Swiss-Prot record:
Biological process according to GO: mismatch repair; negative regulation of DNA recombination; rescue of stalled ribosome
Family listed: Belongs to the DNA mismatch repair MutS family. MutS2 subfamily.
Record-linked PROSITE patterns: DNA_MISMATCH_REPAIR_2, SMR
Name of the molecule in the record: Endonuclease MutS2
Gene assigned in the entry: mutS2
Residues that hold ATP according to the record: 328-335
Occurrences of domain Smr (ranges): 704-779
EC number: 3.1.-.-, 3.6.4.-
Biological source species: Streptococcus agalactiae serotype III (strain NEM316)
Amino acid sequence: MNNKILEQLEFNKVKELILPYLKTEQSQEELSELEPMTEAPKIEKSFNEISDMEQIFVEHHSFGIVSLSSISESLKRLELSADLNIQELLVIKKVLQSSSDMIHFYSDLDNVSFQSLDRLFENLEQFPNLQGSFQAINDGGFLEHFASPELERIRRQLTNSERRVRQILQDMLKEKAELLSENLIASRSGRSVLPVKNTYRNRISGVVHDISSSGSTVYIEPRAVVTLNEEITQLRADERHEESRILHAFSDLLRPHVATIRNNAWILGHLDFVRAKYLFMSDNKATIPEISNDSTLALINVRHPLLSNPVANDLHFDQDLTAIVITGPNTGGKTIMLKTLGLAQLMGQSGLPVLADKGSKIAVFNNIFADIGDEQSIEQSLSTFSSHMTHIVSILNEADHNSLVLFDELGAGTDPQEGASLAMAILEHLRLSNIKTMATTHYPELKAYGIETNFVENASMEFDAETLSPTYRFMQGVPGRSNAFEIASRLGLAPFIVKQAKQMTDSDSDVNRIIEQLEAQTLETRRRLDHIKEIEQENLKFNRAVKKLYNEFSHERDKELEKIYQEAQEIVDMALNESDTILKKLNDKSQLKPHEIIDAKAQIKKLAPQVDLSKNKVLNKAKKIKAARAPRIGDDIIVTSYGQRGTLTSQLKDGRWEAQVGIIKMTLTQDEFTLVRVQEEQKVKSKQINVVKKADSSGPRARLDLRGKRYEEAMQELDNFIDQALLNNMGQVDIIHGIGTGVIREGVTKYLRRNKHVKHFAYAPQNAGGSGATIVTLG
């Protein structure tokens, strides 16, 4: 599509309306490159994405995405084997975290049926290993001391040396106070110094690093701290070297994943762009138009996007209709209507919502041409007419049946009679070429052309004779007429003069009466349509209110059911805890073997009341993502009767499967277990399985990682993990639950507080996970 139309209709200003809604630099780049598309499937895809985003907002009322800088240059540098600085790594860390958050957000979506966005969400990749490593970079762009053992050692030594220097200098401040200009420790060239009065410079031995501008103060590094300061200087150099080494290592970690990270960044930016388009649509009461298979246009209550408080109008361009000619005097809003049509079409073909009501329809044109300039008159120079005619000639040479042509004041700038003839001839050529055209003119001759010619329709802008001002209401099918006599009368022109003027135009009186009747009929039809629209709006508000109440009721019902389930689960947990106590006593007396204890515990669990979870959203979602393929050796499974997780190890000749479930090997039929969906990142690396080894209480500690788990799944794994740890006499275990929303962390705390076998538990030290991990002492 030609770029000139974008300038003429100020399409860039429309794009600026969307800019405030964007949060990522990637989406800003996408907006800047946005242009009208000429392929209906691509436009339809853009509209489907907005519809999907609307569903997300209806269900969740928000779609969170953080501000992200562009990482394109950083990724190019990685491809060139360059190392990234810490700020570049911090931005990539945010992209990785945002990708993970978006994946979890998508997995939690309920009652949303996507048409296009699902492919974007599913193409996002997670990098748990990279994210774990990048925890060493804090949000302030600083490397944490636990980034490497060497960095921790250097910083510890640095802290100790600086503390010793401060202590020595603090003592000297007290002892040599009368020799100092100020009672403080200063810094010069990265070394700690004392501000000594120049007259006493020889009283303190050391190295002079600076002299004040007045010469009254000398900054001396006392000899007592010279060696320590040199040590600090060396340690800082070592620190910089180690930080550079760590940044190099981080860059090497990222290099194999550049293409995937780039794809993630693009998806996040595109989702942000779709979000912005939806918010623009919502705030401006815009809609997603339908796309016609032919050149049909139907814009209902369409508004100009760049005007404040624009007047809404209906415009219908049926398939058979070739041209609409807007006639009537100037200053009535004809040019605005012309631009409104052009901008609505440009926005729609760019995949943007259109400022029109639901049910509106756009066509798909290969090109849109316009000759729109300042209003012309016969007093203007011939050069202006020549300029416009040159442009019109160019349009006629390039336009075809897949084009939309817009002419403002066609034929103006020359003799009225010749101009009107030229305008009719140009419109006739476009009509015969089947090219959709809208033209404005103040020539009365074109009214007759619009009435007498097939597939051409007149239109005009409404004028309020009472207020003597235009209403900017578009009246399709009604030719424009002059209101000169009414205006002159209301402004006080003598009645006999007005009467005489009317007599001089008797030949046009019949036409004017017909136009007046058409105007009256159009206004009456519009009033009826407005009344119908008011009723439709009331019905729409009522339907929305009913839907909102239903959603609120469903939400409250789900909360109550969840609460009841939790209470029931607590009762079951209490019973199971009692059984654990009995089993532990038996184990302590060596009356049962470990596998016999687990079998006994499974029998006890069968006594627990069975809860009907057929309508549980979480379990239903788990069923949805269950692998739709035959099981294979190595697949992760959940044993239905036990609710425990295991791994398929082999298949027997009779079709049954052998599975390792904790420390027990089981034989199962295929209907006794379900497959667990394996994340993409787990396909490229061996799955890490937490194994509790037999050891005494002072031996190695077991670790359970619950990050990314569902609440029910996490609690089940935690219960099984503690069981195995107790059976194997583990004295201490680590549970990694992350920080996240805090749901898993709170669940772990509640479980440990209730479990009688837990002697003590507390968050891990800061360098071992902090509040993202819990250390548990068993006994």
